[in-house]
Amino acid sequence: MTESKVVLDEDDIRRTLVRIAHEVVEKNSGRPVALVGIHRRGAHLATRLHQLVCDLLDEQVPLGDIDIAFYRDDLNTRRPDPHVNASNLNFRLEDYTVVLVDDVLYTGRTVRAAIEALFDYGRPARVQLAVLADRGHRELPIRPDYVGKNLPTARSERVNVRVEAS
């Protein structure tokens, strides 16, 4: 039997995103920032984080999302017909610090794929990473700039994130 445990409820997620928004604004003071969510749940979190950052700055910042289906290094070992979403990056990356947003950081392979996909659209001034949960167990030298919750897990455990789309 698999044991299920809620680690962050909706209020916790909201408070965590508010904190991360403050950190993003503080760390990037005076520099143009754009948020890019990694499909699927990262895109929902990026939308929520975007609104908070815009409210703090009292201005609009670019928001996009990126699909990494064809950039994954396990593409051949997954389903033969990967689910592909359109990426939406309607701004020049070169002008911005791009904050990649994802739900859970685990091995780092998703982030590696997202960075590769991002650079196919241009060369950002810098790239930062914001995650709701960091599980550890990295296989690549990837470290988040903004972490909602450090969540040590066994490799055999799963972390499921359920977020309401805004």
Where are the regions a protein language model picked out?
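PRPP-associated nucleotide enzymes
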Residues: M1-S166
